[in-house]
Every structure is written in C-alpha cells, then in structure tokens.
Swiss-Prot record:
This is Putative neuropeptide precursor protein. Coiled coil: none annotated. Residues 38-57 have a biased composition (Basic and acidic residues). Residues 177-191 have a biased composition (Low complexity). Residues 18-89, 136-208 are annotated as: Disordered. GO terms for cellular component: cytoplasm; extracellular region. Residues 19-31, 72-89 have a biased composition (Polar residues). It comes from Bombyx mori. Residues 1-17 form the signal peptide. Detected in the brain and frontal ganglion and in the axons connecting to the corpus cardiacum and corpus allatum (at protein level). Detected in the brain-subesophageal ganglion (brain-SG) complex, fat body, midgut and ovary. Expression in the brain-SG complex is 2-3 times higher than in the other tissues. Its main location: cytoplasm. It comes from the Eukaryota.
Length: 372
C-alpha cells in the first residue's frame, strides 16, 4: 500500500515538472499575451495551428479579443469611437461623422456669385469698327454690352431686368410714319418731330383700316360662332346618352281637341325605327341626324331585322332550354360559393326578360328594359 502511494506522488511531481507547451519565442504561455499584440501582423505568434484557419477569420480582427476579455474589447470599441486622435487602423470610414457634415449655406454662395457678376459686368468693351469704348457706370448699365458667354452666366431675373431697361431706353419714342423723320429727334429732352411719334403705350402692332363699327361686328360674329360651337357640343353629348332630341317637334300635352297626345297612336319616323337605338350599326346615322344632315346609310326594314337578329344571336343564347338551365345554375346558392356571388330570383327574372327575343312591328315603338 505504501508502495502504491509513493508511486502516485512521484507521477504527480513528474507531470508538474513538464514545461507548458508554448507557441512563442520567449517561452511565455499563451494566456499571457504581450501588449499591443496583433494576430494579423505576426505569423510567428499566431494561435492557429495552420494558416488556413487564420485566413477564415481574416475579416474579424477582434475575434480573439472578444473571447475571455470582454472588458478589453469594450474599451477598444469606446476608444475607437470616442478618441479625438486615432491612429487610423480601426476607424470605421462609413460611420465617421466628419464625412456627413451639413451642406454649405446657399446665402454665402449667392452673395459671392452676385459680387463676382457685378465685378465682371461693371465695365465692358463695346465692339465696333475701329473704336473701343469702355462704358463704366455706377449702376452697372454696362451689362447690356456683355459678351454672350457672360450673358449666359446671368440669372433669369437679371436677364429680364436688363432686357426691360434696354427696351424702355430704346423705345422712348416709336416712329409712326415718314421716311425723313429720324428716331434720334424724338427723345424726352429734345423737342423732336412729335407729329410722327407717339408714346410706346399707344402704339399698335398691326395698323388696319377698319373702323370701330367693323371691329364690333367682327367681335359679335366671333362670339356667335363660339356660342354655336358650344351648343353643338352640348347637343351631341345629350344625343349620345339620351337619343336624338329635336326641339322643333315639341308639342303641348293637350292638343286643340282636348285630348292627351300620348294616349293616341304614335307614328314613328323612318329614322327612329332602327332598333336597338344605341347599337353599332345605327351610331353613324344618329351622329348625322344630330347635326341636321341627311342619313348616311339608308337601312331598309328587311336589312334592319337581319342585322338585329345577328346582333342578338351574338350576345344572347339561341336555345331557350339552354338559357333557362344556365339561369337555374346561376341561381343555385350552393354552387360557386367562393368565386360567384349568389343572385336572387328578381335579378334572374330581369335577366330573362332582357334576353327574351322581341319583334319590331311597323308602327309600334319598342322600349328597352333597363336594369338599375
């Protein structure tokens, strides 16, 4: 027993005497890392067994400092963002506040630009055949002789102000007639030939020989034409929705015999016999009748019945039994619950009445059944 105890103690002492494996040159342990140690720069002091493992964590230089040294990692982060002077190695260039400053004030730019423009336009060279005159004024009137590239640099407000000043100075007197009279003699200060000139506010761009009565007559004619256009437009819009309305055919409800006219048999004209009224083959005739023109296409009774039958077959069911079967299926509440809205019996009856064939008689009007 004593022999076993001595053997165990000897083994423990032998194990404790074995040096700790180290990957550093100076023999220090791995847990005791030197200060300012960077795993990305020194390959000899790397903790990775091979270089491939190190390359996998290359974008994360703080991976090791996060493990087991949370205080140091937080201190590094605080130092990176709060330090006024940084070495630049760990700066985040995307979130740097100096890269996202306020834009420069526009007032300063505008004043500098205006000052530069005034200096450039204070005196300019006036081109001529042999004379070079320099126009220098305190108010900057020399801007009227600016070069085209200088004028392009002016703002729109300055260009309009300059143009208005030139127009007023040039148009102080406008010549009306006479080849001998010169514009130089009609200035504000000189007496000038005032007969041949009038103020610019009274000049006319087009002088005509029309009298005042002629002008009024032309104005009345133009107003009547505009009113007529508006009446035609309104009448066409009403005819498009309500059919042709002729105000000349209006008559009182009670005639001279004392009878109500709508109780008597109605004789329909040849234009109103085409049915349906708003179909594709009667549209052109209705447009012509609304404007008072004769019928573009004369449609006979036989041709009219044939066209109506073709149109009815295209949009309605030809078989009566098939029509009722479809109506029965549509009225079933248990069918098509998800994608079909159930309809009541009144709606189905109205659909059947609308789709029923109707025959146009000679002098009996046919009324369309509208479902609201």
């Amino acid at each position: 027993m004593l022999l076993f105890s001595l053997t165990a103690i000897t083994a423990v002492l032998a194990v404790s005497a074995v040096p700790t494996p180290s990957n550093n040159k100076d023999g220090s342990t791995i847990s005791e890392l030197p200060e300012n140690w960077d795993q990305t720069k020194d390959d000899n002091r790397s903790l990775f067994l091979n270089k491939s493992d190190k390359n996998d964590l290359e974008p994360y230089p703080l991976a090791l400092s996060e493990e087991g040294n949370q205080d140091g990692y937080d201190q590094t982060v605080d130092q990176r963002f709060d330090s006024p002077q940084s070495n630049g190695e760990l700066d985040n260039l995307i979130m740097r506040p100096e890269l996202y400053g306020e834009p420069p004030a526009m007032e300063g730019l505008a004043s500098a630009f205006d000052l530069q423009r005034r200096k450039r336009g204070s005196g300019t060279k006036v081109g001529g055949a042999g004379a070079a005159t320099k126009v220098v004024t305190k108010s900057g009137s020399g801007k009227k002789n600016l070069k085209p590239e200088d004028q392009a640099a002016l703002s729109p407000i300055d260009l309009m102000t300059q143009h208005e000043a030139q127009r007023r100075k040039r148009g102080s007197g406008t010549k009306v007639g006479g080849a001998a009279a010169s514009a130089k003699t009609a200035t504000k200060n000189s007496g000038g030939n005032k007969k041949n000139f009038r103020p610019i506010s009274e000049r006319r761009k087009r002088d005509s020989g029309l009298s005042a009565a002629d002008v009024r007559a032309l104005l009345n004619l133009w107003e009547a034409q505009e009113r007529r256009k508006q009446e035609y437009a309104n009448q066409f819009a009403a005819d498009r929705y309500y059919g042709r309305v002729n105000p000349d055919e209006e008559q009182p409800e009670v005639d001279e015999n004392g009878d109500l006219w709508y109780n008597e048999p109605v004789v329909i004209g040849p234009h109103d016999r085409d049915y349906p009224h708003h179909s594709y083959f009667s549209e052109q005739n209705r447009m012509a009748l609304a404007r008072g023109y004769p019928d573009l296409y004369q449609v006979g009774p036989n041709e009219l019945a044939q066209r109506y039958e073709e149109a009815r077959r295209k949009r309605q069911y030809a078989n009566k039994m098939k029509r009722f079967m479809v109506a029965k299926k549509r009225s079933d509440n248990m069918m098509h619950q998800n994608n079909y809205r159930p309809r009541d019996d009144l709606y189905t009856l109205a659909e059947l009445l609308r789709s029923a064939p109707r025959v146009q008689e000679q002098d009996i009007p046919v009324y369309r059944r509208l479902i609201l």
